[in-house]
């Protein structure tokens, strides 16, 4: 997959260079330079004063990488440092860091913003295959316009002319290239830039029809019926919702009717975002997502201004949420996202996270934003998730430069609720091709949130064993089972429960064998027990937030599965509760 992706990118880069990287195209992008904005949207998003202070010293941190740029800003070496990752490069050229300078405030921060924008114009005013990628252009146009009042409303006429001229050129480029084979969050960001340029720059309102058409086409495909984003990544969901709120804002400030599909998408995505939060206000960790800043999440929810009802279940997004007392469990009950949307996807089907109040207990390991970094591949693997692995094999193939291949063809899920508990029964056939085994996971959370019971079964795959929900899925399951190799014996398996770094754990001898005592940061104690396997405490890491990996522990239940299959029952009991 990565080879074909690289070949496509090589071919596309060559075509783009011929079409856009010439003086004639520079002339095509020319046009009348406007003297002022027709509309100025507000930018409600927070920045970091600490990051702003670092930027005064030309130190930039994006995507887990910090670089100090020692060359003058009006040189190419400043804007294209040799050791920058792709994600870092995108962060620099998107100019979202202008918010950090605004948060710092003062004349020095404003002067630095103008110096850096002018330096960029010296080096990248004409098309460049990297810095003019549609998503980067879209972010840059929106950030320059949205932060107009901070860095160039009071600037001299020469500076203002250069910025307005570049904004016009970048907007015309977006109008010519979109959708440019883009999809997912990158396309939404590019559309946002086109909307800002089209609605805020006088005489560019011709973009409006294109913006409406692109929104209709994109939102109809990428925002699912329950409000989830098709990439199944909570961080991407947050970013897309934020972009859509910005697009709605620029329609409003320009006094143009907001597209109905845009309003509907925001109203559906808002409760889905709440669905993906833990009690600490941050996000669950699935498919490359991070915790994210809870203050930013609150701002997004407030700006969404949606009165949609909260979700109990997300059947299209394919996540399930169990809530009892102050306890919360979120289960990934679906396959990775489809091709074209799975670059950030993980092989974490049927993994779950478990929190109580504001404290996370069981988590997934997190992610790394740079596809070429070895951490990205390692964290995308099944073993970095709180679920089952067989013989250290991924449930979906993990591609080294991002993405997955050969995902489970069948993932089923049933939800049952009573007055006493919520039960989820889910299964996937990702291990059928290699081992002829179906993984079935059952979770029960009691109404008080004192006990989480689970059972993980590895069952020989036979036609109908996946409990498919329809005739078409039954046919798929039967085909998968009939082509599967016979189960072999013995095969080692491991059920992993990665613990949050704030959780302390130790193995103790119990009446029925070894158990694990967990203690949260607040001192609340939980006891983990298991039947059908051997309990071990092992090292793990946590990358749910920015910064270096944080050491932590994982509970691992080991066992072997043979021709007859295997089953392990396990439970987390709050210590004051009766098991």
Predicted feature residues:
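Aromatic-lined, polymer-binding surfaces characteristic
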Residues: 85-266
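Residues that flank catalytic or metal-binding motifs in active/ligand-binding sites
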Residues: 93, 318, 350, 384, ...
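Extreme N-terminal leader/anchor segments
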Residues: 1-72
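Short, solvent-exposed loop/turn segments at the edges of secondary structure
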Residues: 189, 347-349, 383-385
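Helix-turn-helix repeat elements of alpha-solenoid scaffolds
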Residues: 68-74, 109-114
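Short strand-coil-strand connectors
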Residues: 63, 323-327, 357, 391, ...
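Carbohydrate-active enzyme catalytic cores, enriched for enzymes
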Residues: 224, 228-365, 417, 552, ...
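CBM-like, beta-strand-rich accessory domains located in the C-terminal region of large
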Residues: 86, 138, 184, 367-579
